[in-house]
């Protein structure tokens, strides 16, 4: 039977001082499944009984090994009283005819972890398989197969010992599009296996490095209806879909890594007919203004200030987050590549970032790249994309919600104490603000330094990034490609001891300064990543833990549905933010009680009277959609697009509470015409009257 000792039983054992064999007594909090216990099962094949040496209990089971697929399997399945972390150890009798690669697999709450043990040495004692999280009951197990080196594998006892949980951390690598990783099924299989062997729990896969398909690593690494597919993918293969399936089977998250603004290295962008037809969406350096698309830092790049560019990028985010079971979206190069950029390729385009700046600021002419107000506006442009993407990711129809919204953050030079002195600030990447506002769930600071040359830079950035995390996760991006194994291990250990929320290594395929060395993965699992761990939870996205929620929406001209740029949004009378070029706003960290909190949100914009919604429900960890139509706004036009149609009816159906059963769900206040905190037949009659308007 499975042996679980209570405190009372332990006391009796101490008094009796029983020792049936020469092995130590079972300790409190331990569960041991021997090969004669009910929790042990022969799943397949022939297993003989042996008693040579000093087994745990009376005997053990053994099977002849085989090459290729396993022909014999056994399982130890404990009954655990509580969910939690457990040290898992195996007992076996060693011998010269034993396999030196006995294939154990631990099936735990977050997936399955293969471990290979040398049974020729170290037996007649407990040998660790690692520390794993198990759910209470009988859902966990340890399995042994016989596909190993000659001649036999030994199945004796497995011990599960409850321990304190290691700190949850994000352990990922960047898998870039320029090397092996996910171009075909075998590459994905190998990548996932290496992630498991290294005790990684997430993969950041570069599914969009360029928006054209001119050469390898350019194009989409998923079946996209928006971006042309990359040319170096095996025929008929969907890299992202297959990667998600294989990684999830191993308990590993997959995050879609996207570069938003980098389109191509030549004009026009091959295969991308949408971007070919919109050269006005591109940004150039100040000296190239108005001359059509020109390279910036050798690359053709989109204009971060263009509303149409934002919509194009959000369509990509929605496709990934809604159509694929990704676990997150990860941005890279979410910044300007140089300060002397952000100017329009075509001056006739009235929605360029520069034209928006002129309209909003009242400035005339073309500002210098060093102009402080113009620089602040370019920071605003990039921030507008990040905060909008935060909503698209958080509200995606995805079974893995809550998804993680993350970004790679630059950390060039030594770490200053003021964020405005950072290289990120100079490239208009205001990432401390993004973390402070909660637009990111985690920032991944690209702390890429050779530890033999710049040890203080690395450590200073680790320490400073923790201070700038506010109440979100900060993760250290570490560079094996610049270091030998020993220095990488030293850097990772420093960051973990400092208290970061995780490590991301760059990159999957380049694991040392000497190049590609796959032995990195068993090395790191034997050192800094010694045990498998779970990813950190996001308490701000858990309604049982969070104390705040988010309001978002669009502000439009109610008569036409056209977006209103730079409208001011107020919460309970206080200014809380402005709309972007698409009329989109996001207000985070709004206090909410256990049952939600009603608050007033209002909007003011030049040329319109103020519009007030007095009873907007904010829910803990919730995302309340609150759209505004300025001027002539039809009752029932939920999405404020200038009409009352089937889209609005779908919303009304979900908000209909009946009399006295309010308040309506978050966002439903817009249908409560008589402001009696419900949506009933009175409100429905008004909706009917305007439907089709």
Model-derived features: positions:
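Active-site-adjacent "subsite" loops/lids of carbohydrate-active enzymes
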Residues: 166-185, 256, 261-323
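Substrate-binding cleft of secreted/luminal carbohydrate-active enzymes
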Residues: 431-432, 436-455, 465, 472-541
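Cellulosome-associated attachment modules in secreted, modular CAZymes
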Residues: 624-693
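Short beta-strand-plus-loop segments that form exposed binding edges in beta-rich domains
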Residues: 143-152
């Amino acid at each position: 039977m499975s042996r679980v000792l209570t405190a009372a039983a332990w006391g009796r054992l101490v008094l009796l001082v029983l020792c049936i064999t020469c092995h130590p007594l079972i300790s409190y909090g331990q569960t041991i499944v021997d090969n004669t216990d009910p929790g042990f099962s022969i799943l397949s094949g022939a297993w003989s009984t042996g008693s040579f040496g000093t087994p745990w209990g009376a005997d053990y089971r053994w099977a002849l090994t085989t090459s290729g697929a396993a022909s014999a399997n056994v399982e130890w399945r404990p009954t655990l009283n509580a969910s939690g972390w457990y040290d898992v150890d195996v007992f076996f009798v060693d011998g010269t005819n034993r396999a030196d690669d006995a294939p154990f697999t631990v099936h735990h709450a977050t997936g399955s972890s293969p471990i290979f043990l040398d049974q020729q040495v170290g037996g007649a004692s407990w040998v660790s398989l690692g520390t794993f999280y198990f759910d209470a009951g009988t859902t966990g197990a340890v399995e042994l197969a016989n596909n190993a080196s000659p001649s036999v594998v030994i199945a004796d006892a497995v011990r599960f010992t409850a321990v304190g949980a290691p700190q949850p951390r994000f352990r990922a690598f960047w898998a870039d599009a320029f090397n092996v990783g996910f171009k075909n099924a075998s590459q994905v299989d190998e990548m996932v296996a290496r992630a498991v062997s290294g005790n990684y729990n997430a993969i950041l896969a570069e599914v969009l490095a360029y928006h054209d398909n001119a050469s390898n690593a350019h194009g989409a690494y998923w079946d996209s209806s928006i971006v042309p597919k990359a040319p170096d993918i095996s025929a008929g293969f969907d890299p992202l879909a297959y990667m998600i399936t294989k990684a999830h089977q191993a308990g590993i998250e997959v995050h879609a890594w996207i570069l938003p603004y980098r389109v191509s290295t030549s004009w026009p962008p091959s295969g991308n007919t949408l971007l070919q037809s919109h050269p006005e969406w591109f940004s150039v350096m100040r000296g190239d203004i108005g001359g059509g698309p020109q390279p910036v830092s050798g690359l053709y790049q989109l204009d971060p200030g263009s509303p149409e560019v934002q919509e194009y990028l959000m369509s990509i985010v929605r496709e990934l987050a809604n159509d694929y079971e990704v676990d997150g979206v990860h941005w890279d190069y979410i910044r300007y590549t140089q300060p002397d950029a952000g100017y329009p390729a075509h001056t006739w385009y009235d929605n360029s970032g520069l034209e928006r700046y002129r309209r909003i600021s009242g400035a005339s002419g073309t500002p210098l790249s060093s102009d402080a107000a113009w620089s602040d506006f370019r920071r605003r442009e990039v921030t507008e994309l990040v905060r909008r993407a935060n909503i698209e990711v958080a509200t995606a129809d995805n079974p893995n919600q809550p998804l993680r919204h993350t970004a790679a953050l630059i950390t060039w030079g030594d770490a200053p104490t003021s964020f405005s002195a950072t290289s990120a600030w100079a490239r208009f990447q205001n990432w401390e603000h993004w973390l402070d506002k909660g637009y990111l769930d985690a920032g991944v600071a690209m702390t890429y330094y050779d530890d033999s040359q710049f040890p203080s830079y690395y450590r200073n950035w680790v320490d400073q990034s923790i201070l700038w995390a506010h109440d979100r996760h900060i993760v250290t991006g570490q560079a094996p490609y610049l270091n030998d194994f020993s220095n990488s291990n030293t850097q990772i250990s420093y960051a973990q001891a400092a208290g970061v929320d995780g490590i991301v290594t760059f990159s999957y395929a380049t694991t040392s300064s000497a190049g590609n060395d796959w032995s990195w993965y068993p090395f790191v699992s034997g050192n800094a990543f010694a045990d498998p761990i779970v990813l950190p939870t996001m308490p701000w996205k858990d309604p049982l833990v969070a104390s705040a929620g988010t309001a978002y929406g669009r502000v439009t001209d109610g008569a036409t549905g056209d977006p209103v740029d730079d409208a001011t949004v107020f919460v309970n009378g206080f200014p809380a933010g402005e709309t972007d070029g698409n009329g989109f706003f996001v207000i985070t960290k709004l206090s909410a009680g256990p049952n939600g909190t009603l608050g007033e949100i209002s909007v003011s914009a030049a040329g319109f009277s103020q519009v007030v919604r007095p009873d907007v429900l904010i829910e803990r960890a919730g995302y309340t959609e609150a759209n505004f139509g300025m001027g002539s706004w039809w009752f029932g036009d939920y999405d404020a697009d200038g009409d009352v149609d089937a889209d609005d009816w779908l919303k009304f159906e979900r908000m209909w509470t009946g009399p006295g059963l309010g308040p309506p769900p978050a966002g439903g206040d817009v249908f409560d015409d008589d402001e009696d905190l419900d949506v009933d037949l009175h409100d429905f009659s008004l909706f009917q009257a305007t439907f089709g308007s």
